[in-house]
Amino acid sequence: FVELISRSGLFAWISVKILKVSGGDPFKLLICFSGLTVVFSAFLNNVTAMIIVGSLTIVACKKLKLSAMPFLLAEGIYTNIGGLLTLISSIPNIIVGTAAGIKYTDFLIVAGPYCLIAFVATLYLVRYLFKIKPLSNEVEKAKAKVMVDAFDEWETVEDRTFFYLSALVLCAIILGFALHSSIPVLNQMGLEVIAIIGATVMLVIYPTDVEGVLNEVEWTLVLFFLGLFTLLGVMEHAGVLTMIGELLKTPLSAGETIGPIAMMWSSAFFSGLTDNIPLAAVLAKVLEGFQSNIAELDWFADYGHMLWWSLIFGAGLGGNFTPIGSASTVVAIGILKKEGHNVTFMQYVKIGAIVVLVQLTLATGYLFGAEKVGLIKKMNTEKASTEEVQGHGSNGH
């Protein structure tokens, strides 16, 4: 479905429109591209979002004679904020959200406000770290506007009928996701069924190269999941997950404040050192084990819901810690290298560590505040239907 939308030129069209809104001002450009990155990474594969926005960023920076490094590194950071926005925005969200029984709308209600807070805080943090300054006078603003107006948003749109159809179907799909649990007919479908229906409608009304689209499917990711969940099953039967659970029981049961903090910060740390998908899968299995024995674990009954959310936030945000903790950051650094900008491991860590520290501090305060005002509620012990999220493993680090 996403590949069909991409081929229509819709995403590139949106990108250029937003670029023109900035007027060529570096800080406004940072705001626009960061916002675009969050939106794209919320609905697309994080790597795809980084490639789309990153390629446009390179062109824009060349035209405006700006260094692309701060913009691309910022976009790599923002993909992880966008990946936290909805239940299907990233693979860890899907894995943990399914195990915890979190609905699409409930996830958005909890994660949405934090993403907005993190967006603004990270924006000014990145502006400070990279010393991005707005245009200072009217002459500079007028010159930049002339450059930006030279962009043609319709350049990548080969067929306007296909373009408008894609926009209509995309809006319908997003609306279907949001209203999934509220409308009985949609509630009987998995989210993947809604996406498949959208793609089918586009193929029927506007036939295209089906074989070419299928070639773009991330089959290696599908095989990765087959292997991952097979391995998790073996680990579960061999008692490895039980052993991990026993090791984690002490810090996680240390209290309704210490437990969630320990989960969030430790998962964020390890997420920055390794891929967050297997990390989220293993820890979700461990929490599932605690949940299945909730009658015997009073502490999990009291604040288990906070442990689930702490894992979601920790695994999602920790990837900003190192350049290898997030696939989108790897892509951003790769694009920069092609353009002659080399970013070393330690150069990135000096920035990433500060960003993660600020984002996790905000997330910690936010989660406890959200629970206090009733945004985060105690969860049912039963799992969410796996049908709700199967097939949407398109986003990871």
Q: What do these predicted regions represent?
A:
Residues 183-188, 255-256, 291-304, 338-341, ...:
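Short helix-coil transition/hinge motifs at the ends and kinks of transmembrane helices
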